């Protein structure tokens, strides 16, 4: 069974191998130098694909790939450090996200922006830098970045407060299917924030977000439907 798993792992990593003992298979994997392949091996250990989950091994392989400049591995290291998977290493989160972000990794740009919003992961609070990073993600069409940029305009964080621009961004992300933005668009129509009140539009957007399981959208949908029945 273990031999079969190792052969499957070699296949996942893109290595063609004939039958061999486990130690030989491990030895072949250890000789892998391609960073993209190293990252895929890390994914196997991180996600429990083919082999049992092993955080230490996942990190070891991600680090091998990240040290060679693999943006995906750098992003994954940042994610692990951010979510406390590595005790005492959280300050490294921003470092790894930044390395990936500088290579154009859109999700890493977004996550680094989150750290700047919170003043966490090895960086101090800097709303202007968060906005810059969210804007990069938004320009690449990443819905989460579009939504967060909208929130920055809504709250006046790092940019002058502009509810009209916030609505435009929320609407854009909502049309991409992002539930939190759908909910916010519903709120805009429900409350008349910079747009004409429109309960039907509010219901439509609340329902879209509720259909994706967003609790607050379910609550507002239920409330608005009950009000319309009176």
Where are these regions (language model features)?
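Hydrophobic face of amphipathic alpha-helices that form TPR/SEL1-like repeat modules
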Residues: 40-47, 76-83, 111-118, 123, ...
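Positively charged n-region of N-terminal signal peptides that target proteins for export
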Residues: 1-4
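N-terminal segments that cap or nucleate solenoid repeat domains
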Residues: 18-49, 64
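Structural signature of tandem alpha-helical TPR/SEL1-like repeats
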Residues: 19-23, 52-61, 85-96, 123-133, ...
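Hydrophobic h-region of N-terminal signal peptides that target proteins for export
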Residues: 10-17
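Short helix-capping/linker turns of helical repeat alpha-solenoids
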Residues: 30-35, 47-49, 67-70, 83-85, ...
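Terminal, low-structured helical/coil segments at or just beyond the last alpha-helical repeat
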Residues: 21-24, 28, 208-230
